[in-house]
C-alpha cells in the first residue's frame, strides 16, 4: 500500500519491545491513527522528541494491517516544552488530549475540525493566552459541539422554546424551561449559563470578570454533560489544577477547586 502524509497531534504513546513505541495520533484527514515508531527509544533515533505527546507534526506513514508505521516526522509546533514545565498547564493539556481521543471515535474518519480545535487549545495553553480553566471549558464545549453533543443553552433542550432558562439537566440535554423541567434539574446561579454560552461562542470579553464561583459551577456542568455522553469518566479531569495556582498569571487569586465542580 502507498505511503500517506497528514498533519497530526500526538495524543499518547506507550512502549513496544526494546526500542519502539506505539503512538496515537489525531490527524486531520485520517482521524485517529495508531502507528509504530521504530527505534524511537534509542538515543540516536531519527525522530528525536518529535513524537512526544502535545507535539503538532507533519507525519508520513506506511499503512499496516493492524498498525501503521511512522516513516518521517517534521515538527510544526513544539508545544511540549511550555506545557510540561508547569503542572497546571500539563494536567489541563492532558485532559484536552484525552477528550480529543474519546470524541474522535472511530479510526480513519476525517477529523479536520477537531484537529484544528485541539491545536488551537494546546497553543493557547502553551502561550498562556488566557486562564487555563477557561481554555479547557471552552474546548470541551466546542468539542462536544463537533460531536453533536453540545448542551442547549439559549433554548429549551426539550421543546426548543427560546431562553434564557434557569434550570439545567444533563440527561435532558442542557437548559430546560419551566414546563419541561424534569426531576433532578439544577438551577445554577445567575451568570453560569451565560458564561457557558460565551465560552462556546468564543466571546472572551464576556468571561474576563466572571467570579470564580460561577466558573466553578460552569465547569461542573460542562464536565458532567461531557461525561454523561461519554458514558464514563475522563481519567485526567480530576487531576486538573483549578483556582489560585491556575490563575496567578492573570492577576487572580482564587480558591482551589475540583474539576467536577
Swiss-Prot record:
Keyword Disulfide bond: no
Database matches in InterPro entries: ARFGAP/RecO, DNA_rep/recomb_RecO_N, NA-bd_OB-fold, RecO, RecO_C
Organism name: Mycobacteroides abscessus (strain ATCC 19977 / DSM 44196 / CCUG 20993 / CIP 104536 / JCM 13569 / NCTC 13031 / TMC 1543 / L948)
Cellular component GO terms, alphabetical: bacterial nucleoid
UniProt keywords, alphabetically: DNA damage, DNA recombination, DNA repair
DNA repair recorded as keyword: yes
Similarity remark: Belongs to the RecO family.
Gene3D superfamilies: Nucleic acid-binding proteins, Recombination protein O, C-terminal domain
Its biological purpose: Involved in DNA repair and RecF pathway recombination.
Chain segments annotated as coiled-coil in the UniProt record: none
UniProt-recorded name of the protein: DNA repair protein RecO
